[in-house]
Amino acid sequence: MRIVLIHGYKSSPRQNFWPWLSDALRERGHDVVAPELPNPAEPICQEWVDTIKKSIHRPAGDTVFIAHSLGCVALLHYLEQADMAGTPKAIILISAPFHIASERFASFFVPPVDFETVMWKGQEFILVHAKDDAVIPFDHAKRYEQELNGALKEIETGGHLMDVTELSILLDLIDDRNTVPGDSLHDDFSDIHVVL
C-alpha cells in the first residue's frame, strides 16, 4: 500500500512518532510518503494543501492517509480538492481539531470542511484520539465520527500524542487493512469451479 503521513502544527516528519512509523511501515513493504509541510509554526492551510498535492499527485484505492492534529484539517481540505485515480482505502485522523477559535488557525477552519464532499473521498474514516487530550478535547473526535460516519478508536492516555515516540495502534490499523481481496475465502471456495 501507499501510505501518506501528514504531520501537524510545530512538527515535521522527523518528530514525534513519525520516524518510528515510517520505518515500521517500510519494513512491512509499504511505500511511504511523508511531505514536510511549510512554516509549521505559522501555518497557512492552502500552503499545506498545495504541498500535499505536489507530494501525492493522484491517490488511488491502495492509498492510506494518516494525519495528526492540524494536519488532519489540511488533509480534509486536500481531499475536498483532490483529483483521484480511486477512492483511498482509509483516512486515519489522529487528535484532529474540529474547530479552533483562534485567528492564527483561521485559514484551516474558514471556510469549514465540506463534509458532504469529503465523506466520499475515503473508503473509511478512522479517528484515533486520547481521552485525556487537553489540547484538543475528546469531543472533537466525536464530532468527526458523526460528520464522517467514522470509526472512533479511543486511547485512554497519551494527551495530544505530541510526546509519543511509538503508537502501535497505527500499525494494527494498517495491518488490518492490508489484505488481498479473496484471501479469507480461498479455503471455503477452493473446490468451486464456474463453467460458462
Where are these regions (language model features)?
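Gly/Ala-rich beta-loop-alpha elbow adjacent to hydrolase catalytic centers
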Residues: 65-76
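Conserved alpha/beta-hydrolase fold motif
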Residues: 64-66, 91, 127
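Short glycine-rich catalytic loops that host catalytic nucleophiles or stabilize transition states
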Residues: 35-38, 153-159, 164
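Catalytic histidine-centered segment of alpha/beta-hydrolase-like enzymes
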Residues: 43-44, 158-171
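Short beta-strand/loop motif that positions the catalytic acidic residue
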Residues: 121, 126-129, 133
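Active-site catalytic motif of lipid deacylating hydrolases and related acyltransferases
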Residues: 1-61
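Conserved alpha/beta-hydrolase "acid-adjacent" motif
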Residues: 134-140, 163
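Active-site nucleophile loop of the alpha/beta-hydrolase fold
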Residues: 8, 37-40, 91-101
